[in-house]
Amino acid sequence: MAITWADILDWTTGPLDSIASDLAASSKALVSAANDGQDCAAAIQSQGSAVTAIRTAAAKNMASLAQVATNVNSAMMAIEGARDGVATVMANVQSAQAYAAENHCTIAADGSVSSNAYNEDETTKQQAFLAADSLQKTVNKIIKDADQVDTD
């Protein structure tokens, strides 16, 4: 499904911020658990085959925890990248909306741009017409960028 201007207007970074925060907390907990496990395994002073087996199992478990922490960090980086993409698109939308308001233009839900300087003098109408043309290109780029963010 293609992204529309109306879809983009509903975007927010809040859910992505929340997920990134949850992943950061999970990563911290996993790293802490792996460190605690390594400390405990290192503290074992006994010798023997059972202790060697425990150390081997503990080392495998700590390596697994470290791998999970790495995976969580990778997910967190991806989420943060998506959040940055959404934030950039949102900033561009706000800029386009401000430009539209300043130049007697309207951006419709489908992303089409029109001039609304009907009751203005001829110079203002001409400027609004030119602004609408420029703004249409900007809106098209924002929609394209948003589609890329959504796809990535």
Where are the language model's segments positioned?
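N-terminal secretion-targeting helices of virulence/extracellular proteins
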Residues: 1-151
